[in-house]
C-alpha cells in the first residue's frame, strides 16, 4: 500500500480539524518580567508541557510515598540508619518538587491572571506542600544552629518541625491531579458538600442538644465504682471491666465480698467517656451516633443511676442520629451522583451534536481509507492463497514425477476428516448434554473442595487428591475440545473461556510444582479454590443471572477509580497516623495493642479498621492515652479519628452505595417498552428453551455498551453497566412478574389476590368490599342461601367483628409478652394460661364462622385458598394442640408454645396498609434472589479459600509460651495488670477460637460476621498470627493474610452488600410507585397536587386596637426575632458552661441565669399572646412548643427553688423522711431532672429560624409520616423475635463478665426488645449469639433438673440471630433509608422544577392579600401576587405584564360572582400549569380525566373542593380566560386600526372593506394567538412575543406607561383615533405608582368606591388619557386589567350623576364627530352571569371626572337624569341593545370558527363584546356596523351562512381547549411555563 494514496492525502487535509486538546492559554507576561519570547520561559513551557515530564513527576511522587511508607517510627524519637537515609532522600524529593513548582510558575505566571499557577486548586495543594517542606528544612537548620549554641532548647524546637513534617503525607494527594477519573469522583463529592454541610449542621445540632441533656442528667454520675474496702484496688469479677455503681436507687450494687461503692474513680475508658462537661459530653454522644460502643455507655449509665429511663435517651439518639440523619448523607450523595451523571449525559449529547458534522467529514475520509485497506487486504489474501496453491501445484507435479501421490491424498483426506471432526467437536461443545456434563464436573469439583475440613481422615485426603487430578484432566480435555472445535480466535473471544484457560493452566502448574517439590502444597492450593469460580458456568443458560454477573464485573471495573481514591485516602491517613502515633501505643499494662501505627502495613490495617467503623473508639482512646490521657494535648487526638471516620465511613463508603443505588435506579428508568420487549423475548426463549443468546441480542448488547455516554464524571465510570444488569434482574423477577412489568401478568395464572402484587394504597384507605359467598356449599351441608351461612357471612364482614378480633389479637400478644420465662409455674403464668384459653376459643370461633361462610378448601375462594388464612389456621391449631398436650413430650410443647408467637402476624391480614408493606417485602425478597445467590456463591468461594488457608490453625494455649496441645498442661502464673504484686495461678487450657475456618460451614459463618463488620479485627489478627495446623500462634506471623480479609470486605461488605441494599431501596421505591402506576401522575406531581388540595390559607392576624397593634408590630419585626435568636444562643452557651465539680459561685450564677432566661422567655410568650390573642398564638405549632417549654421551665425554676430551700434536709427527694443514708450527690434532684430538659429544649426553637435546616426538618417530619406501616412492621418483627427470645433464652443465668448479664438479657420483655435493638445496630451481636448457644449456665430460679445446670441456651441461636440480623440490617433499616431517600430527593433535586416545598411561599404571600384567611382574593390581585412569588411557582418580578396575563389565561381559574378567585383553585391552577398536568389535547376531556384521577387517588376529597379547582363540564361560569380572549381581540383590532391610520395618514372612510379587514384580523391574528395561549404552547408564544414587541417598536404602538406594574407595555391604547398630530401626545394626568407601593394589600383599598358598586366592576380607569380628556369613558378593555389605578390630581373633582350615568354603559350620545356609545364591555362578560336575570346589574365604579379638558357644550349635553332610571328599565334597555346585532354576530362567529375558536363562537356574550370592539376599531356606530354586515352577508350565498353558523356549534372540537357549553370557558389549558 502506497503512503501517498489519495485517501491518505484527503485524510491529512482533514486531520487538523480534529479538536485539539486544549492547552492552557498562556499569559503574555509571567512574574511581571518574563514575556512569551523569553528563552527561559520558552524552555520552561516546553518542559512542563512535555508528556514524559508529567510521568516523571508522578513516578517521583510514587517513590516519595514508598519512602514515607518504609520509614519506621520509634518510641521516644529514636532513629536507625534506614530512617536517617530516608531523611536525606527527603531533600532530593523536595528539590525535584521545588523545581517543578518553579518551572510551572515561570511557564504559567503566579497568581494575577486567569489560568495562572495558583488559580488551580491542585496547584495550590502542590505549592503548599512544597512551601511547607522548604520551611521545615529551614527550621531544622535553625534548630541545628540553636542546638550548637543552646543545647537545652533543642528538644522544644524540634517538635514544631515534627508537626510540619506531618504535612509531607499529603503528597500522595498529588496523584489525584494526575489521574482524571479520580478528579471526577472527588468533584462529585465536592458538589455534594453544600447539602452535606446542611446535614452536618443538623448532626452537630443534635449532638449539642443531646450533649447538653446528657450534661444535665448524667454529669458526675460515672465516678463511683466498687473498691475493696480500705484499698484502691477496683473489685471486678473475671473478664469484667470496672463499671460505675450506686449506693442507693436501682443502680448496680457491689456484690463482691469485702467491696464497697465509693467515688474517686476516673471513669470508664480511663475517664474519657462521661458527661462531666460539654466537650466530653459531645464526644460521648458522637461516639453513640456512630453506633460503636453505645451500649457500653448505656450500661454504664444504667449501673450508675438505674435502668428505668436512660434507655429512652440512648434509643432516641440512635434512631434520630444514626438511622435518620446519617442516612441523609446517603440520600444527598446518591442525589448528587444522579445529577452529575445527568449533566455528563447532557454535556455528551451537546458535544455529539456539535461534533457530528465534523465527525461525518472525518468518517468519510476514514471510511474510504479503511475500505481501500480492506480491498487491498483481501487482494493480498487472495494472492497469498493463489501463490500457495500455485506452489502446491508445482510441488504436486514434482511429487507426481517422484510418484508420491499417496502422501498428497493422505494430506487431503486428513484435512477433510479434520474439518468434519472440528464440526462434530463444535456441535458437541455447543450441545446441552456437554454443558450439563461440565456442570456436573463443576459440581463434583465444588463438592471435593467443600468437603475439606480439619482433622479429616486419610482416605478422604487421598480421595480429594485423586479427584483433583481426575477433574483437572477432565477440565483440560474440555478446554482442548473447545479450542479445537471453536478455533483459538473464537475461543479466546469469550472472557469466561479466558478465565477457564487461566484456571486450568494454573491447576496444571500447581500439580507440576508440587510434584517436583518446588513448592509447598499449601501456598498454591488457593488456586484450586479459584476453580470454584467455575460455578458461575451455571449462569450460561440462566440469562438473568449471567447478566447480573456480567454487570457486576463491569461495575467492579467502574468502581476502580473509587477504590483508588479510597486507597489514596487510606494511605494518607496511615502515613499521618504513623507520624502521630508511631511507636506510641506502648502502655504500662502488659496487654499488646494490636491496632497500632508502628509500621506501614499495620497502619494501613488500622486505618481500614476505622473506616469499617469496627471498634474505632478503642483506637481513639488508645491515641488519647498515648498523648497523656483526657487532658489538653491528648484530647486533640480525637480530631484525627473523627475526621477519618467522617470522611471515610460516612462519605467514601456511602459513595459506594450511592453509585449502586444510582445505577440501579438509572437502570430502572429503562422504558417500559424495553422491559416488555425483554420480557417477551424471554418468554419466547423460555417456551422454545433456546440455550444460547441470539446473535441479535449479542449485537444489541454490544451496541448498548458503545452507547454509554462519553461525558466525564463518575456518572460514566460508575455507570456500572447496570443497565443490562437491571433489565435482566427485572427478567429474573419471575415469581411475580406482575409486580414489575406494567400491565404484565403471570403467564399461567391471572391476577390472584394472593400474589404479592401490592394493592394500591388508594384502595387501602377505604374499607374493602365484602367478598361474596362462594357458589359451592360449605362442609357439604350449607348451601349459599342457607340462613345460618348468610348470618355468618354478615357477622364475618361486619366492621365491629374485624375490630373485635384485632383487639383480641392485640390482647393475646400482650399476654405472650407478659409471661415469665424463668418460673414456668408462677402465679402470673397461671393467670395468663386461663386468658390464653379464652383467646384461643375466640379465634377458634372466628375460624369456624369463616369456614362456614367461605367453605374449607375444596372450591375456589374457600378459606384455605388464601395464604393469610392458612397462617390464621396454623396459629389457632398450634394453640389448640399445645393446650391438649399439657404435660407429655416437653420439647414438642416448647416448640408449639414458641409458634404461638405468630399471633400478631394475623393482624397483617386485617390492617390493609400493613399488608401492603409485607407484600412489598416479599416482592423485594423475590427480586433480590439473584443477588443473594451471587453473594452466597462468592461467600462460599471465600469460605473454601479460608478453609485452605486457616483450617486447624486457630488453636492456642491460654499460656502463650506453650505451642502444642501436649505442652499445654498444668498451671502457670499471671501478673494482673502487669503488677508484680498481684499474682494469680491459672490452669493451662488448649482453646479453640469461637469463629474459625475448620470446615466450610464454620468458615461461612465466620465470614458472615466479618461482612457485618462485627469483631473482624480479632479474627484478622488470629489469622495473621496463625502458624500451622494444631500449633499455637506466632505474633505477626503472616501479615499478608490481611489481604484475604480486606479483599473480602471490599468485595462482599462494601460492594455486594451495598448493591444488595441499593436493590432493596430501588425495589421499595418501585413498589411505592406501583400503587400509582395507572394514575398518570409522577411522585412530585402527586405531592404538589395533594398539597394544593389539602392546603388552607394562613390567618395573618393584624390587630385593630392601636396598643395591641404596637405590640404586634414589635413581636413580628425581624429585630425581635434576632434578639430572641441571640438569647437562645446565650442560653445554650450558659447551659454548655456547666460542668462537674463546679464551684458554689458557678452554681449560683447558673441558677440566676436560668431564672433570668425563664423570665425573658415567659415575657416573650406573654407579648406574643397579647399580640396574637390566644387563637392566633396557638395556631402556630412552634408557639405551642414555646408555650410548653415556658411552662416546663417555670416548674423547673419553682422545683429547684424548693429544692434549694429544703437542701439542708436532703432535697425534695426526702420530704417524706427516711433520707438519712442518702448521698446528697445521688439524690441530685431526680424529681426535677425531667423538667430540666425544658431548658435544653429551647435550643430546638433555633431550628425554626434556619432556612436550610427547616426544610430538612420539614422533610424529616414528612418521612416520619411515610413510616407508620413500616414502623408497625418493625414493631411486629421485634415483638415476635423478643417473645421467641424470652421462650428460648430466658432461662440463661446472668453472669457478669459475659454477654448475658444484668444489663443485657432475655428475662423480661422490655429487656429482650432492648437486646434486639442492640443487635439491630450491630453491637457485638455475634458475641450475644455465642452467649446464647447451647451449654450455658441456667438461672438458679428456673426449673432445671438436678445435674442439668449447664443445659440452657440452644444452638437454634445461630438461626435466630442470623435471621434477625439479616432482616434488620438489610430490610428494615433499608426501609428507613428508602423512605428518607424518597423524601430527601429535594435536597439535591433541580430547584427549577416545582416541588411541594415551594408551595409554602404561596401561602405566606396569599396571607398578605387575605389576612382573614377567607380563602378568596380579588382576581385583580392575583397578577401582583404571582409576580411577587419567584419562579418556578410564581412569575417573578421581571415577567412582562403581557406574558403574566397570558399565563393567567392559561391557568384560567373560575371567578366567583363577586369577582374573587379561591385559594385552592389558584394554587391548583399554578401547580397544574407549572407541572403540565393534563394540559395537552382536548381540554374538557383532560379536565374530566384529571377529576377522575383525583377521585381515584384522594378518595376523601370533597366534591365541593373538586368543583372549585376543576369545574365540571357544563358549568356556566366566568373565568379569567374570557377576559384575556376579549382583551387579545381588542388589541389586535387596535393594531389593525393603527396600521390603517398610518397607511392612509387619516381616518379611513367607513365601508364594508374595513369591516372585512377587521374580521380578517380576528381570523388571522387574534384567533391563532388565543389558540396558542389556551393550548399552553407558550414556547412558540414567547418567540412571537419578542417578534411582536420588535414590530411594535417599529410601529410605535406600545407606549410605556407607569401603571400598576411599574414599566408595563400599555395595551390599553386609546380606541378612538385622533388627528395624526395628537397621536403621540400624553397629557400628564396620572402619577406613576411603583411596584413596591402597590404590593401592599392596603394600598388597593385606598381608593374610594361607591358603596353600591360591586368590587368586580371597578371603574376601568385604565383608558388612554386622551379618551378621558375627550370625555370618553371607554370600557371596552378586558376587566383583568381594570385595576390600574391613578391617583387623583384634582382634589376638587367630584362625582356627578352624569359621570356615573356614563359609567353605567347606557348609550349616552355625546355630540362631536368622534363620539361613540360607551357600552361597558364587562356587562357583556360578567353582569349577565353574576346576577340572576331580571335583577339589576351592579353599577361599576365611577370614572373620575375630568373637568377642564372637556368642552362646555359637551358637558352640558350629557343628560343629567340618567341615574334616576329604575334598575329594571336599565337592564331591559341594555338587553335590547345587546340583542340588536344578529348580522354582526354571525360574521364574527364565522371569523372565529375559521380561526379555530368554535367554542368561543358559541358564546353570545363573547360575540357581543367582540362586536363592540370591532365597532370601536372601525370607529362606527353599532348600527352602522350592522347595516354593513347585513350587506356583506347578502353578498355571500345563504348556504354558506347556514353552514358557518352551524359550524360555530359543531367545530367546538376543533379547539379542544375551550369549553363547548355556552360561555363556559373557565377551563382553559394552562400554558407551558
Curated annotation (Swiss-Prot):
**Quick one: where's region Disordered?**
1-23, 675-717, 731-757, 1731-1780
Task: Return the protein name.
Answer: Voltage-dependent L-type calcium channel subunit alpha-1S
**Which residue ranges does the entry give as Cytoplasmic-facing topology?**
1-51, 107-115, 180-196, 331-432, 484-494, 543-561, 654-799, 851-866, 912-930, 1061-1118, 1171-1180, 1251-1268, 1382-1873
What disease is this chain connected with?
Periodic paralysis hypokalemic 1: An autosomal dominant disorder manifested by episodic flaccid generalized muscle weakness associated with falls of serum potassium levels. Malignant hyperthermia 5: Autosomal dominant disorder that is potentially lethal in susceptible individuals on exposure to commonly used inhalational anesthetics and depolarizing muscle relaxants.
Transcription is among the record's keywords: no
What tissues has this protein been observed in? Skeletal muscle specific.
The organism is Homo sapiens (Human)
Could you tell me what reaction this enzyme catalyses? Ca(2+)(in) = Ca(2+)(out)
Q: Where are the III repeats?
A: 786-1068
Q: Which residues carry this modification: Phosphoserine?
A: 393, 397, 687, 1575, 1617
Would you list which residues are glycosylated?
A: 79, 257, 1141
Q: What is the effect of changing residue 1367 to V?
A: In CMYO18; uncertain significance; patient myotubes show decreased depolarization-induced release of sequestered calcium ion into cytosol compared to control
Q: Where are the transmembrane segments?
A: 52-70, 86-106, 116-136, 161-179, 197-218, 310-330, 433-451, 463-483, 495-514, 524-542, 562-581, 634-653, 800-818, 831-850, 867-885, 893-911, 931-950, 1039-1060, 1119-1140, 1149-1170, 1181-1200, 1232-1250, 1269-1289, 1357-1381
Looking at the record, which segments are called Binding to the beta subunit?
A: 357-374
Residues recorded as binding Ca(2+), renumbered to this chain, are 292, 614, 1014
Q: Which domain of life is it from?
A: Eukaryota
